[in-house]
Amino acid sequence: YGLTVDGVTRQTLEYDALSRRTKEVVTLSGGSKRENLYVFGTINHLTDTDSLLGSMSNGTDSWNYTYDNAGNITAITSGEKRISYQSDELNQLIRENNGVLNETILYTYDAGGNMTSRKTYDYTEGTLQTIKKNETFTYRSDGWKDQILSWNGYRYTYDAGGNPTLLRGVPLTWGEGRRLKKVSLSWGTVDFAYDSDGKRVKKTSGNTETKYYYNGSILSGLVRTTAGSTGTTKTTVQFVYDAEGKPFMLRFNGKTDYFYLYNGLGD
């Protein structure tokens, strides 16, 4: 399994008997290689038949993942960096101790599972100190009860189809059902056009026009043209996907390749 681009093997994949990815080798520009190894069923309650990832390494860094008995992730550890998570009996995340961002975040929810608050503190695994940021969210009390109405003072409004018409103070215009046609900003508008299948094919923002191209339903590339006082500049981007359909690389202006690199959870 793998991927070949312009005659060069860019990705090779190996799987175990349960079709879980166990190894990936990516050949980057210049010929350097990145090898990702995936291990299942080696941490805490995980068994050999679990689909939950236990650890991942790429030759430079490694990540270990732990879970509770419901399958909720409880910690990610990479060297001295650690992020721990706490979930409630409804499997909702209620606390995140993020040693990477040096923040601890608490979450609360309403009876429908909508987040109602997000409170940020300095990082600690223990007792919380002075709050740094307090974000609140409100929702409709009737009808479509998961429609957010406000976030920290920003209002949200919707049309009859549930499309947001005001998003954090920014007006949005919709057409033909659920197709976003226009975003109205302080400096002007951003306009969108679609084909007969509903795929976005053009975006116009000021003096910049972006056209999108597809292979079936998959975005294969875009061309961005900007008109300026010194002439017109054109930028092209081609997208390449791996055998699993994930974005693998993009080619910028036909000559420079950039690669998507993921952690064990696909981020």
Regions found by a protein language model. Give the residues of each.
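Acidic/glycine-rich beta-solenoid
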Residues: 1-260
